[in-house]
Amino acid sequence: MGEINRRNFLKVSILGAAAAAVASASAVKGMVSPLVADAADIVAPITETSEFPYKVDAKYQRYNSLKNFFEKTFDPEANKTPIKFHYDDVSKITGKKDTGKDLPTLNAERLGIKGRPATHTETSILFHTQHLGAMLTQRHNETGWTGLDEALNAGAWAVEFDYSGFNATGGGPGSVIPLYPINPMTNEIANEPVMVPGLYNWDNIDVESVRQQGQQWKFESKEEASKIVKKATRLLGADLVGIAPYDERWTYSTWGRKIYKPCKMPNGRTKYLPWDLPKMLSGGGVEVFGHAKFEPDWEKYAGFKPKSVIVFVLEEDYEAIRTSPSVISSATVGKSYSNMAEVAYKIAVFLRKLGYYAAPCGNDTGISVPMAVQAGLGEAGRNGLLITQKFGPRHRIAKVYTDLELAPDKPRKFGVREFCRLCKKCADACPAQAISHEKDPKVLQPEDCEVAENPYTEKWHLDSNRCGSFWAYNGSPCSNCVAVCSWNKVETWNHDVARVATQIPLLQDAARKFDEWFGYNGPVNPDERLESGYVQNMVKDFWNNPESIKQ
């Protein structure tokens, strides 16, 4: 069959399948599966580009990491005025009820504050205090927020909180953690901790020793080096890996580290924290301690100038994400954050033993999504997350900077942006209405941005103050925008359907409907997800199914 005829045949096949879907979703699934992979490759082929695929205006300036929602929390100035949303009432834009506009007042009431909304700092610290288990959530003991669920969440986040340096919030350089020394002669643990490097450790002292001994490993080519490094990265725990060239545009303009001070805990121990937890729990209000700020000087803090960035992705559990916004969905996010640090540390040690400098990073040091796009791992979606072909947005990103020159991968396009233009499901599912409903992304201007956004790049607007306000109200991270995403599937044929639908005019309006016809995602409306019992049923399924659903 000629290529044109084959293309037409497949288009007709998909159109017929779509029409039949209304009558019989299960039958269509059987019809479509054998066809969609070929159809997607012909109608919507995956392409590579040598240039960064999104517009970056000449006015673009590097992002200050201390402006992001969670790092801004620890700026005392953010505790002086009420938290501000970019749009006070998004119902004027969406035509739907604004389910997020009252969150600042509700969060203030949760803190015992009357007569005003919560500040930015109060909002975020309310979230952190509940998330760390120091304060019960308002849903405590409901299905998905029980002591069992919360214990799983604590275990999942433990490495990130205790050994990574709490770098999930951003910052840099590297990480520091408080540890309690032990007397090896008496086995007594000290009451006072000391600050030491965490897993995101930039100590490259071993590299010079390897080089001085003439033991630096020499690769035959950049291509061979990339192949070996990718293989090692997968073995050490990554699910996906790509190589990006070092691009200074994505390095934060300011690095920062939260200032920790000693806080006396009820058990008599001193705990170092970036906010005064005992004062808050006793009703004395919220107090934070600010930042230590650093110029982004690679040679000073890491001993080298990066040439390449190893960017890797860790999958989050499909069944756990389906329970969003429950604590179970937070647990798989926490597991990935904990694993990010472990895997990044192991990659860094591997490189150092070969005689190359390395700086392992999580959300700190630089913006992960554009680096992952450059590394060919996916596209940037409406929800601001990286959409991969295999996991959709259901993953976390980490990276390791190195002076080893590697052959970079190329950005790939497989239909995500075209699909996001049509779908808007994540925007509809957001309890805070933080995600733009505009059809097309655009190069954002300063007036389009809330304080945590960086203007002059092409994307959809996101309001992190709205998002963070719901996290505080919920007492746990929310992953609704991930859970309902049509790319969040363990069967990749659905992704092929999405790619095809964006390219055929008659199917475009139905693009987001395919997975709904096939029974995926549950309710999109955030209130209905809870009120219908869907989230509660997904939590029960999670605990009752001993084997995880894997890709």
UniProtKB/Swiss-Prot annotation:
Its cofactor is [4Fe-4S] cluster; corrinoid. SUPFAM superfamilies: 4Fe-4S ferredoxins. One of its GO terms (cellular component) is plasma membrane. [4Fe-4S] cluster 2 binds at residues 430, 467, 478, 481. Disruption phenotype: Chloroform inhibits the growth of the wild-type strain, but not the growth of the PCE-nondechlorinating small deletion (SD) and large deletion (LD) variants, where the former fails to transcribe the pceABC genes caused by a deletion of the promoter and the latter lost the entire pceABCT gene cluster. InterPro entries: 4Fe4S_Fe-S-bd, 4Fe4S_Fe_S_CS, RDH, TAT_signal, TAT_signal_bac_arc. Optimum pH is 7.0-7.5. Its main location: cytoplasm. Keywords: 4Fe-4S, Cell membrane, Cytoplasm, Iron, Iron-sulfur, Membrane, Metal-binding, Oxidoreductase, Repeat, Secreted, Signal. [4Fe-4S] cluster 1 binds at residues 420, 423, 426, 485. Predicted to be exported by the Tat system. The position of the signal peptide cleavage has been experimentally proven. It catalyses: trichloroethene + chloride + A + H(+) = tetrachloroethene + AH2; trichloroethene + AH2 = (Z)-1,2-dichloroethene + chloride + A + H(+). It is found in: Cytoplasm; Cell membrane; Secreted. Belongs to the PceA family. This is Tetrachloroethene reductive dehalogenase. It comes from Desulfitobacterium hafniense (strain Y51). The gene is pceA.
